[in-house]
């Protein structure tokens, strides 16, 4: 439904890629359009090194002959999608199950550019369940402890979904996903990472019906 808007956001973000950059390459449907467009630039002589945030994105990069290297200390820009964002640049991420690697790459990048369609905007984060990656060990108890914070929680695909790190994803439905919940949830033993991304995004590329709006996050 919003495929053209996702493509618009990806194409606009690609204009910021320069020779010899080391870039984070995200996961998901919008990131696919970015990878597809990046492959054309590489084919035409652009020199970059990519740090994919999931095995799926790594496979895509390699199939498009995009150089990949995980042994990079400094990342210039991370390009990734989001499930939801608010006016302050807070994000919900992890719908594709790659939130741990996505957060590692975003945190270690000088800039974090978020590519979305117009439907991903919310005044308050509430539309998308909050993904939380947890260790399999005593995971039922971890879920119970998360629910004590006031949400309805369930294992993604009844534990059939396994992250690239070998863990489960718990999807949490809050009436409002307060960004402050990130630290509270991370204090629960068994929690690996939380899909709230605070103070990380620097630009948001929001695809629209007739172009792309670039939002500078203050």
Swiss-Prot record:
One term under GO cellular component: cytosol
Active site: 102 (proton acceptor)
InterPro entries documented for this protein: NagB/RpiA_transferase-like, Ribose5P_isomerase_typA_subgr, Ribose5P_isomerase_type_A
Residues binding substrate, per UniProt: 27-30, 80-83, 93-96, 120
Top EC class of this enzyme: isomerase
Entry-linked HAMAP family: Rib_5P_isom_A
Subunit relationships: Homodimer.
UniProt-recorded name of the protein: Ribose-5-phosphate isomerase A
């Amino acid at each position: 439904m919003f495929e053209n808007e996702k493509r618009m956001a990806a194409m606009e973000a690609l204009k910021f890629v320069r020779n010899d950059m080391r870039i984070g390459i995200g996961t998901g449907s919008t990131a696919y359009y970015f990878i597809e467009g990046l492959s054309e630039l590489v084919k035409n002589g652009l020199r970059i090194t990519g740090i994919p945030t999931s095995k799926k994105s790594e496979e895509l990069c390699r199939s498009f002959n995009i150089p990949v290297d995980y042994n990079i200390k400094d990342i210039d820009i991370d390009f990734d999608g989001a499930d939801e964002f608010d006016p302050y640049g807070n994000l919900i991420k992890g719908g594709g199950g790659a939130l741990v690697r996505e957060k590692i790459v975003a945190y270690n990048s000088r800039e974090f550019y978020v590519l979305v369609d117009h439907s991903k905007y919310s005044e308050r984060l509430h539309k998308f369940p909050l993904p939380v990656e947890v260790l399999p060990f005593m995971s039922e108890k971890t879920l119970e402890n998360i629910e004590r914070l006031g949400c309805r929680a369930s294992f993604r695909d009844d534990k059939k979904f396994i992250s690239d790190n070998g863990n489960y994803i718990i999807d949490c439905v809050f009436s409002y996903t307060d960004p402050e919940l990130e630290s509270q949830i991370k204090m629960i033993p068994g929690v690996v990472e939380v899909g709230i991304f605070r103070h990380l995004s620097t630009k948001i590329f929001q695809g629209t019906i007739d172009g792309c709006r670039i939002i500078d996050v203050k």
